[in-house]
Amino acid sequence: MLQALLIFVLQIIYVPILTIRTILLVKNQTRSAAGVGLLEGAIYIVSLGIVFQDLSNWMNIVAYVIGFSAGLLLGGYIENKLAIGYITYQVSLLDRCNELVDELRHSGFGVTVFEGEGINSIRYRLDIVAKRSREKELLEIINEIAPKAFMSSYEIRSFKGGYLTKAMKKRALMKKKDHHAS
């Protein structure tokens, strides 16, 4: 029984680590992923080793399977809280909605406005880049000012140039100055 509990706990730890490592690889953060992978590998070997010691012990096998499933739930929760990376939203509007554009820019989001041809009239599209950790804030602003907007989103793997890059460089320089001042 103690072994089954240990296996369950190890799986609850192992699977979220596996989730984080996978996300880091997808985000092209290979060094961080390799570091996390060391811990992941050690936990994997220990827990699977306990299961393989006695394959007739069904409690250990059940603990492994249930722990894996619970670990997936926990891993997904942790991933959402970490919100690593950036996201782009494309927002389609019937009118230009300067109020929305101004509020988004004032809140620090990068916004580009496009004018396009719809079936019956001119349409406007906003491309908005944000850190995933600010996605909820972004959606609240859009839904408050333009609740009927059509939105689609996708994650950004990498980017170069533009407002966001300049803003990040500016913040990094300010942090450097603050660090040297202390």
Curated annotation (Swiss-Prot):
Compartmental location: Cell membrane
Transmembrane helix keyword on record: yes
Membrane topology label: Multi-pass membrane protein
Pfam families membership: DUF2179, DUF5698
Transmembrane region(s): 6-26, 32-52, 58-78
Keywords tagged on the record: Cell membrane, Membrane, Transmembrane, Transmembrane helix
First-listed, main subcellular location of the protein, grouped into a coarse class: membrane
Source taxon at top rank: Bacteria
Gene Ontology CC: one annotated term: plasma membrane
Similarity annotation: Belongs to the UPF0316 family.
Protein name: UPF0316 protein BCAH187_A3394
Lineage, broadest ranks: Bacteria, Bacillati, Bacillota, Bacilli, Bacillales
